[in-house]
């Protein structure tokens, strides 16, 4: 069978969650499947992270905007290649496409109420696009894939889909993520010493950046050690604005804002952290949880949405809407060495349940059933 896979953004330099998911899936399919023929549709970019192989063809499709690329250029390219099944991997798909569709619907956050603060223009436009497209394509899709039981139940309840249309397939994590010895050359690009708290921030309200910074300020008031906080995926000006809004500018000297951290550096960043804070209000899966655990790092995460499902009892669970709950867990990890050690060991064991090979094998089952 000729299978097309939409992977529009994997050639861009700064990749994020869904980009890595489809990239890892493609890599595994290249390894394990020699029967089907694959056409990987990408937008041109600087990072040629996958190459064509005997039965896997990388097709660069040029188009200036995301909607036009997906709605016009992608179905045209798929038709030219004789694709018999098109897998769209990032929540949306062409509305007018005669090729049988499989859609990975990571979440339906775009159908839920907005956060308490406005998102960026880019985020708002993306939300509007998904709200317009998904209802139009959902019935046309032969199968919907999602990434956790939490999200599967959420999708079924809100979209009223027929039984069996949604298939849950867990994500994996890259085995590149493993415990690393301290490397001053790598760590020094971002922070000057190890044993910091590490937090992946964002302006998206679901990432809970404001409340996590509030929790850190409470931690500093009570801690004797007063570890620094390394914040990634957010601009310094945005952190400064939050601190100013809450009258916390005095803690700025303890916060290091790293911006975007290269994926190749992340194993070192996780490994040298005292703990990883993944305190989102809402996640559909949470690959960073597994990455941190695989690097031997204690994880503080939320007791909401998919995070307890993915972490199990192998992370320190907190109420993400309560800054005091987050702060107290940071302090507990600092003052209770046995507890922290148990979280590290249990986290390492938990990661053994997840792999991209398992994900790819289940994908093949979906393709064969359509």
Feature names for model-found ranges:
Residues 1-370:
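Carbohydrate transferase catalytic cores enriched for Leloir-type hexosyltransferases
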